Amino acid sequence: NEYVDKSGLNICNILDQKIMDNPRVYSKYLAQPNIDAIFYTGYGEKGDGRIKFSDNGKPVIEQRSVLWEGIDGGSNRGEESTVISQINSRSANPHSADGYTFVFVHCWTKNQQSIKTVIDGLNDNVRVVPVDQFVQLVKQNLGPK
């Protein structure tokens, strides 16, 4: 918690496996006063984009799409066109977890141009926001009342 405070960062990313159904893992992080949210990337997992809340109302947000060349050994799952299609086909309802997409970008196989290609291909009803605003919207629209 002290190092999180010193860094000025209050959102963490956890790279692990199968923690969305194990609150004992993420609740320890979210119990820290200087951590506001967790983005969860399941290594090798497809990711369902689930959003859960700890007992103190802080969210853990699972990846829904990946921008990662060769993620499935030859499938197109991590390619720009696939991610664009996935996002454009989903709900854009901010009051449903289905309306939010956390895209994990693999920095060794994709770059800023890949991200720009995805953004440029999104429908007009899709908003791309910085991570802190994403968390704020999730808390505001989906969090415990």
Q: Which role fits each region the language model picked out?
A:
Residues 1-74, 114:
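Catalytic domains of cell-wall/extracellular-matrix polysaccharide-remodeling enzymes
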Residues 4-15, 27-34, 48-50, 80-145:
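C-terminal domain-boundary segment and adjacent tail
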